[in-house]
């Protein structure tokens, strides 16, 4: 069992327990979903529990991560847009809403090149759905088991967006060459 402090909204945890569990049955991926306490609670004194899943993060497996992103999204093809995606107020959620033009409050941080990036935005026509917004460091590989997806970070975006995040993470955090 892996214990961690609740770092999101309780609604997210309940969604993982109910909706994600229902939609992930029989999938080709192992998903780390919350474990209830002996009293049936998902949160106990601010802490949550998740199963230990065998495997390890292996930098450089970006093409496999892209394949996993493309396998993850269809698991939830029938799932409705979770209400909690609009209620989150952490920096990643604010940046996501700003990047997609759904938050008119201005950039979440003052950073160089934001205006250039905003002017480069284009309309995306691909349909949105459930994606994992941070797969790069959250997939465990094990030769005896299917890939394990941990720390599920759910967003309502087109599936290929999660692949784009993997590409950017690969270059920025794992030393991938820009041309790969």
Map each language-model feature to its residues.
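A conserved alpha-helical element in kinase catalytic cores
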Residues: 4-45, 55-75
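Conserved kinase catalytic-core helix
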Residues: 20, 55-90, 112-125
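Alpha-helical scaffold segments that mediate packing/assembly in large oligomeric complexes
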Residues: 85-105
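Conserved catalytic-loop position in the HRD/HxD motif
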Residues: 129-134
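Conserved protein-kinase catalytic-loop segment immediately C-terminal to the catalytic Asp
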Residues: 136-142
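Active-site Asp-x-Gly
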Residues: 142-180
